[in-house]
């Protein structure tokens, strides 16, 4: 299959490199100079250092040329860039199936990726989302990884899951697009919370409690949004939550660790050099939960720490001193 990955960040590069052993893959990046450097060195030194790119992987900064004869398009740009990418695709005369791998809400609108897809792409477009517990470096190195591929068209999800599995990457088909998207977005907020917890040296008990109650918050908002409960017990929910709240490669967890040490958020993000979707998502989720009356105290406290200057230790005390209630 001929497929094009749009977005040469860490995740787009890792997926393109993994699939290049089985398919004819083109990786598109918007910066021509960076693409030329990658083509010469066969390494994405900025986003994925230490992971050689296979010789079969084509690289391009020409949007139209990269999409020529593509049988599948995978959008791997951040949530903030999804609208522009979809708008560019919508101008094309015909489109193959399209997957997106970004995790989060559109800043300022609180819209999920599938809602932007419905707004911008032609009716009847074949689309889906790929999500789950995955660090780009591990996928690029060929470490075993399992992900969820969800589409409203379960037959499409099954067909693409079969085609894209291999090279120690296993995909499971699902049809709950909303649940998969909500899980992928909210786990980033909980990863920031877990980083704060660890940065304050609160121990393993506190982290376990935070992960468990964080899953409850994810599920509440997900079901309220139309997702299914069982989705949050799967790879794109619990699986992704465990990875990003405990793994040191998690950018969102790193944000939390450094916030807990008192570092300014702007400096953290500048030095990180990569997108940490959970920072933007925290604000959107807190507003969405308040609008709908969905109880999400952890997400709300993360938002207050990041944007309202609430000291992390005070936020923890506030959570622990809430009214005692039934667990379920």
Curated annotation (Swiss-Prot):
NADPH binds at residues 11, 30, 103, 136, 251, 275, 277. InterPro entries: 6-PGluconate_DH-like_C_sf, 6PGD_dom2, G3P_DH_NAD-dep, G3P_DH_NAD-dep_C, G3P_DH_NAD-dep_N, NAD(P)-bd_dom_sf. Sn-glycerol 3-phosphate binds at residues 103, 132, 134, 187, 240, 250-252. PROSITE patterns: NAD_G3PDH. Keywords: Cytoplasm, Lipid biosynthesis, Lipid metabolism, NAD, NADP, Nucleotide-binding, Oxidoreductase, Phospholipid biosynthesis, Phospholipid metabolism. PANTHER family: GLYCEROL-3-PHOSPHATE DEHYDROGENASE, GLYCEROL-3-PHOSPHATE DEHYDROGENASE [NAD(+)] 2, CHLOROPLASTIC. It holds the Pfam family NAD_Gly3P_dh_N. It comes from the Bacteria. One of its GO terms (biological process) is glycerol-3-phosphate biosynthetic process. It comes from Thiobacillus denitrificans (strain ATCC 25259 / T1). The active site is at residue 187. One of its GO terms (cellular component) is cytosol. This is Glycerol-3-phosphate dehydrogenase [NAD(P)+]. Belongs to the NAD-dependent glycerol-3-phosphate dehydrogenase family. GO terms for molecular function: glycerol-3-phosphate dehydrogenase [NAD(P)+] activity; NAD binding. Catalyzes the reduction of the glycolytic intermediate dihydroxyacetone phosphate (DHAP) to sn-glycerol 3-phosphate (G3P), the key precursor for phospholipid synthesis. It is found in: Cytoplasm. Its EC number is 1.1.1.94. Pathway: Membrane lipid metabolism; glycerophospholipid metabolism. It catalyses: sn-glycerol 3-phosphate + NAD(+) = dihydroxyacetone phosphate + NADH + H(+); sn-glycerol 3-phosphate + NADP(+) = dihydroxyacetone phosphate + NADPH + H(+).
